[in-house]
């Protein structure tokens, strides 16, 4: 219950609070420390909706967090869930949109000829992931070049949907997204980890895209949010648009 006798009054002094704890430090299952899993968010929102229904009260849900993982087109399970949740009863959902516009973590383009994205990787990066999102109907030839000039072509139709490459002293784990009934975007996910030592190769990494067959030709590259990488790591020619953190893209 908000304090009614305080000198300062907020926008809704008569409001009651439902506080739902999400995420635990040291969570198992690969979740970032302290950051909730998608399932925990779904359960927390569901609990708040049910509680508001039991009390016959309007509900405002505040989700003051987010990350850069996703296609940013509103098609993910979490984004669609929040869209549907906002239509239940008298419900308003407020989601933080982050502050990633100047963090150099996003690059986008429309491929009509050979395109490239140059990524600066700073010193002492223990690992780094890159998301490439495109339309499933588009077929690109994708090449990755290391700072030392070693180059590899990324196969996008391999059986099993995952494989490993090595460029210099960096191992690249490649995961190919599968079609989903509710999404037309395909994800190609790259995880860079050191082969020896503690850090991946620093310098300029180049991603080259060559169109083979295009329908939309649009592509989007995302890095982890700024607090998940060094200040000197980012795209040289970044795209500040569509840098809202997920799930504010719902």
Model-derived regions, located:
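Loop-rich non-cytosolic ectodomains and luminal regions
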Residues: 4-250
């Amino acid at each position: 219950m908000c304090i009614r006798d305080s000198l300062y009054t907020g926008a809704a002094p008569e409001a009651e609070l439902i506080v739902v704890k999400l995420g635990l430090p040291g969570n198992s299952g690969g979740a970032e420390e302290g950051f909730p899993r998608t399932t925990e968010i779904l359960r927390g929102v569901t609990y708040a909706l049910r509680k508001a229904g039991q009390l016959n009260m309007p509900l405002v849900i505040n989700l003051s967090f987010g990350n850069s993982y996703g296609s940013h087109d509103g098609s993910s399970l979490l984004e669609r869930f929040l869209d549907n949740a906002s239509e239940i009863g008298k419900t308003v959902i407020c989601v933080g949109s982050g502050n990633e516009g100047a963090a150099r973590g996003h690059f986008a383009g429309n491929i009509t000829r050979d395109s490239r994205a140059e990524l600066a990787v700073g010193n002492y990066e223990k690992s780094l992931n890159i998301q490439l999102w495109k339309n499933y109907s588009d077929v690109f030839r994708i090449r990755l070049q290391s700072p030392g000039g070693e180059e590899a072509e990324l196969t996008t139709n391999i059986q099993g949907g995952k494989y490993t490459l090595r460029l210099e002293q960096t191992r690249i784990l490649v995961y190919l997204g599968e079609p989903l009934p509710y999404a037309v975007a395909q994800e190609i996910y790259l995880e860079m980890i050191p082969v020896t030592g503690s850090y991946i190769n620093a310098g300029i990494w180049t991603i080259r895209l060559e169109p083979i067959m295009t329908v939309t030709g649009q592509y989007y590259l995302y890095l982890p949010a700024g607090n998940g990488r060094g200040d000197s790591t980012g795209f040289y020619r970044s795209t500040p648009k569509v840098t809202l953190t997920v799930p504010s893209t719902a």
